[in-house]
Swiss-Prot record:
Alphabetical UniProt keywords: Cell membrane, Developmental protein, Growth regulation, Membrane
Function noted in UniProt: Provide a mechanistic link between auxin and plasma membrane H(+)-ATPases (PM H(+)-ATPases, e.g. AHA1 and AHA2), and triggers PM H(+)-ATPases activity by promoting phosphorylation of their C-terminal autoinhibitory domain as a result of PP2C-D subfamily of type 2C phosphatases inhibition, thus leading to the acidification of the apoplast and the facilitation of solutes and water uptake to drive cell expansion. Triggers plant growth probably by promoting cell elongation. Regulates branch angles and bending. Probably involved in light intensity mediated root development.
Induction of the gene: Induced by auxin in an ABP1-dependent manner. Triggered by brassinosteroids, including brassinolide (BL). Accumulates in reduced red/far-red light ration (R:FR) conditions mimicking shaded conditions. Repressed by abscisic acid. Induced by light.
A single Gene Ontology CC term: plasma membrane
The keyword Acetylation is assigned to this record: no
Gene: SAUR9
Stretches of the chain forming a coiled coil according to its record: none
Organism: Arabidopsis thaliana
Protein name, entry field: Protein SMALL AUXIN UP-REGULATED RNA 9
Transport listed as a keyword: no
Main location group: membrane
GO biological process: response to abscisic acid; response to auxin; response to brassinosteroid; response to light intensity; response to red or far red light
Subunit structure: Interacts with and inhibits PP2C-D subfamily of type 2C phosphatases such as PP2C67/PP2C-D1.
Top-level taxon of the source organism: Eukaryota
Length: 104
């Protein structure tokens, strides 16, 4: 029985990540004429972090990291994913840089 529950949790998490990817990729399509999205390589997406909204282009593989998923959940709760300002992560930039240094 525990196996079924963990499989359901994994499927639910995979579905959530798929939705996030869809939203991120649709941001790029909506703003193709915008120079901000021309420099985003395939397999990456831009996020905006901190008080000054510093822009980071991050690999999609980071969506597998629990810590990054937690940041995305905070972003969804605070801003939602469907706003004009891009995917904004409500996190201090120093904390974000420290976190992503662990992913590399």
């Amino acid at each position: 029985m525990a196996i079924k529950k963990s499989n359901k949790a994994a499927l639910s998490q995979a579905a959530s990540l798929k939705q996030i990817l869809k939203r991120c990729s649709s941001l790029g399509k909506k703003n193709q004429g915008n120079c901000y999205f021309n420099d985003v390589p395939k397999g990456h997406f831009p996020v905006y972090v901190g008080q000054h909204r510093s822009r980071y282009v991050v690999p999609i593989s980071w969506l597998d990291h629990h810590e990054f998923q937690s940041l995305l959940q905070l972003a969804e709760e605070e801003f939602g994913f469907e706003h004009e300002m891009g995917l904004t992560i409500p996190c201090d930039e120093v904390v974000f840089r420290s976190l992503i240094s662990m992913f590399r």
